[in-house]
Amino acid sequence: IETLKPKACEIIWKPQIVKEFHTNGMMFQAFDKEENLLETWEVYSVGGGSIMEASESRIGRSEIYPLTKLEDIIKWCKDNCKELWEYVEEYEDKDIWAYLMKIWHSMEKTIDIGLSKTGVLPGTLKYPRKAQMFYKKARREGSRLKNTGLTFAYALAVSEENGGGGIVVTAPTCGACGVVPAVLRSIKEELSLDEEEILKGLAIGGLIGNLIKENASISGAEVGCQGEVGAACSMAAAIATYFYGGTLRQIEYAAEMALEHHLGMTCDPVGGYVQVPCIERNAVAAERALSAANYSLFTDGSHRVSFDEVVITMMETGKDLKCAYRETSEGGLAKNYKIRD
């Protein structure tokens, strides 16, 4: 409304209307002085900050990458003796590495800012920031608990910044923004990785997230939290497996496993805030990503269910979820948790 001033503007909410294209839709209508309709523009927020028009195709777009299935990408990598990050480099613009550097620096900055803050987050939940407490406790622990605690702390730091209106990287969404940065920071410190390696990992994680987005959805409003935290966990698991020296097949297995074991996860934010259960869920998912990576590394990478099959299953499962469990805050924890004074 402020943007369009001094032109008159009215916002009409119609939550009862659910469009087939996507649940998060907005229709702009322009009228002349006589209130005659001049033009209509229908757009949708499909997750991760992406906006699409109703006329665009949701599935199978190949604007940059020619292959839309991980199985086909792995075959390309084997045929060309390439890593997954090299597939990304092959088809992206030359400035991809500068862009990923910007992404990584933003992630690190958000972690540091989140770790520096205490107090409570905005909103009626009065949710306490815990990242700094976790960080301090983890620093005092032995090696086993230390690494776990630091991973928790980094995920909490980013997710708390999101819950407080801070700057985060959608990885793949705001609601799941803590998982990938936490895993990257944790492994960077564990293995003393340089930035060049970090960027390669980011490229792999981005590729996994893009495959999920293009073949299914990363929108909690469309498929529940399996499409947000589940996708983030899958991205982070692939990254971790690459850093730990995993093969192409082990990377695919870790990504598949991380998404598979989030199937059916609901999106039911209490009070409509991206705080409960979202913040804690990011921390747990970061550790689950590392567990998926470790599990895959104990195998030769062979398994029954493919990543591509799980992506399709996730989309179908999300469509079967009631609206109450897809970001509407009408069911689940949002319904049963009573906000306390």
Q: Where are these predicted regions, by residue range?
A:
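C-terminal regulatory domains involved in ligand/effector binding and gene-expression control
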Residues: 2-141, 150
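Accessory "access/gating" subregions that flank catalytic or transport cores
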Residues: 98, 105-224, 332-341
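Generic structural signal for well-ordered, non-membrane alpha-helical segments
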Residues: 21, 93-107, 144, 148-155, ...
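Short alpha-helical interface patches
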Residues: 55-61, 70-82, 89-92, 174, ...
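Functionally critical mobile loop/hinge segments
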Residues: 240-341
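Short, charged low-complexity intrinsically disordered segments located at boundaries
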Residues: 22-24, 133-142, 186-188, 213-217, ...
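Generic secondary-structure transition motif, activating predominantly at the C-termini of alpha-helices
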Residues: 92, 108-115, 159, 163, ...
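Gly/Ser-rich oxyanion-binding loop with an adjacent helix/lid
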Residues: 1-70, 158, 163-171, 176-208, ...
